[in-house]
Amino acid sequence: MSQERLLSVLRAPHISEKATNNAEKSNTVVLKVALDANKAEIAAAVAQLFEVKVDSVRTVVVKGKTKRRGNKMGRRSDWKKAYVTLAEGQNLDFVDSAE
C-alpha cells in the first residue's frame, strides 16, 4: 500500500462512551475511516502507523441524519466506523498521547 493511501485511510479516533468501554474491556479501538477503505487496508494502516499488531477489524457504515434548518432540509454525510481489536499486550491510547 502506498504511503499516500495509508495516510488517507484513517481519519480520526471516534471518542464515545461505548468506544471507551470497548477499549477498557476488549482492547478495541474505534476509528473513523475513509468510506471506500476495506478491512485489509484499515488493518495495514493501523499496524504500520501505530506499530501495533492488529487482531481483527469490524466495520460499519453510519448513515447521515436528515437535518432541518428553518425551511431548508439537508442531510449529513455517511461515514465509516472501524472497530480495530489489538493483539494481547498491545496498547493504543489516544487520550494519554494528547497530553
Curated annotation (Swiss-Prot):
InterPro entries per UniProt: Nucleotide-bd_a/b_plait_sf (IPR012677), Ribosomal_uL23-like (IPR013025), Ribosomal_uL23/eL15/eS24_sf (IPR012678), Ribosomal_uL23_CS (IPR001014)
One annotated GO molecular function: structural constituent of ribosome
GO cellular component: ribonucleoprotein complex; ribosome
Gene3D superfamilies: 3.30.70.330
SUPFAM superfamilies documented for this protein: Ribosomal proteins S24e, L23 and L15e
Keyword annotations: Ribonucleoprotein, Ribosomal protein, RNA-binding, rRNA-binding
Protein's GO biological process: translation
Assigned protein family: Belongs to the universal ribosomal protein uL23 family.
UniProt subunit comment: Part of the 50S ribosomal subunit. Contacts protein L29, and trigger factor when it is bound to the ribosome.
Cited NCBIfam families: PRK05738.1-1, PRK05738.1-3, PRK05738.2-4
Stated role: One of the early assembly proteins it binds 23S rRNA. One of the proteins that surrounds the polypeptide exit tunnel on the outside of the ribosome. Forms the main docking site for trigger factor binding to the ribosome.
PANTHER family the record matches: 60S RIBOSOMAL PROTEIN L23A (PTHR11620)
Protein name according to UniProt: Large ribosomal subunit protein uL23
